[in-house]
């Protein structure tokens, strides 16, 4: 009888482990007493988590995202402030934001996610403190245009550029969604700033450097920032296929002037485009068109 009981327990444990998705790796940015060096280290943690150190594109030293994984799919980023923690969920294969977590005005954890970007089971693994009943699909899409529309920006060109960037602004936007009744406009504005201060800053050291230069103050964004954000795929493709030893085979213009050397782009992370034919040689020698998130 004992043998059958042990076998039954073992079978249940085995089934449970096969049904459960491993929790995502999480990194935390302390916003209670932030510093420029802490922010830079936070971005480096993101890059190091998703990069494949064996991939070298165009003979550069720019980190490259690894091939998509069927098991380790998501990354969790926590913004820890004096009023609590708000979290983002990112897809590791491209750093696209799929969900966020915040407390409501009754101090109940709630997770909000973009349609078709993450399953309920994956969301539970990403944000285990949120019960399934408190998972809610966002009413708008994950692309910048959809989020901007819901942010109801009325100044200038009505794009995210008009909101600015900066750590203090990020803190303000977090306070707008944490322990509050959900307001879609505040939520969308939080997402626009949080995405740019994490995923985009990890992709582009140019953006990171603007944040640290002005740290911790809010500063006006610029057209060049937006051009970088909509050109990640184009830049990655150019470095992957038309760059040798860090030099492009021709001048490239990604919307902010011609460049010939990849280092002038101040890239932080390149999109995964496969393994280049010359990757082994480069390794030895060195011993988007779509506006999406």
UniProtKB/Swiss-Prot annotation:
Keywords: Allergen, Antiviral protein, Glycoprotein, Hydrolase, Plant defense, Protein synthesis inhibitor, Signal, Toxin. Its EC number is 3.2.2.22. It catalyses: Endohydrolysis of the N-glycosidic bond at one specific adenosine on the 28S rRNA. Single-chain ribosome-inactivating protein. It comes from Dianthus caryophyllus (Carnation). Glycans are attached at residue 284. Belongs to the ribosome-inactivating protein family. Type 1 RIP subfamily. Possesses high antiviral potency, but relatively high toxicity to normal cells in culture and to intact animals. Capable of inhibiting HIV-1 infection and replication. Allergy may occur upon exposure to this protein, which needs to be taken into account when considering it for therapeutic purposes. This is Ribosome-inactivating protein dianthin-30. Residues 1-23 form the signal peptide. The keyword Oxidoreductase does not apply. Monomer. InterPro entries: Ribosome-inact_prot_sf (IPR036041), Ribosome_inactivat_1/2 (IPR017989), Ribosome_inactivat_prot (IPR001574), Ribosome_inactivat_prot_CS (IPR017988), Ribosome_inactivat_prot_sub1 (IPR016138), Ribosome_inactivat_prot_sub2 (IPR016139). It is an enzyme of class 3 (hydrolase).
């Amino acid at each position: 009888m004992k043998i059958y009981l042990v076998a039954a327990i073992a079978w249940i444990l085995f089934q449970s482990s096969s049904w459960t998705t491993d929790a995502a790796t999480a990194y935390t940015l302390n916003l209670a007493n932030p510093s420029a060096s802490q922010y830079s280290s936070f971005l480096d943690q993101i890059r190091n988590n998703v990069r494949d150190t064996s991939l070298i594109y165009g003979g550069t030293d720019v980190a490259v995202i690894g091939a998509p994984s069927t098991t380790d799919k998501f990354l969790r980023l926590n913004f820890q402030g004096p009023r609590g923690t708000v979290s983002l969920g990112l897809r590791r294969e491209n750093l696209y934001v799929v969900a966020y977590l915040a407390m409501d005005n009754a101090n109940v954890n709630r997770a909000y996610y973009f349609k078709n970007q993450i399953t309920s089971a994956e969301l539970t693994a990403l944000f285990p403190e949120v019960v399934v009943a408190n998972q809610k699909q966002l009413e708008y899409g994950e692309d910048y245009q959809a989020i901007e529309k819901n942010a109801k920006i009325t100044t200038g060109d009505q794009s995210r550029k008009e909101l600015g960037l900066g750590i203090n602004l990020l803190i303000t936007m977090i306070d707008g969604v944490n322990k509050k009744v959900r307001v879609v406009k505040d939520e969308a504005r939080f997402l626009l700033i949080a995405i740019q201060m994490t995923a985009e800053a990890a992709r582009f050291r140019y953006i990171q450097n603007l944040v640290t230069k002005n740290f911790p103050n809010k500063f006006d964004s610029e057209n060049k920032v937006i051009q970088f954000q909509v050109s990640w795929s184009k830049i990655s493709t150019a470095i992957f296929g038309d760059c040798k030893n860090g030099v492009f085979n021709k001048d490239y213009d990604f919307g902010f002037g011609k460049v010939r050397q990849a280092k002038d782009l101040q890239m932080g992370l390149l999109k995964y485009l496969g393994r280049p034919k010359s990757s082994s040689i480069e390794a030895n020698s060195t011993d988007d068109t779509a506006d999406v998130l």
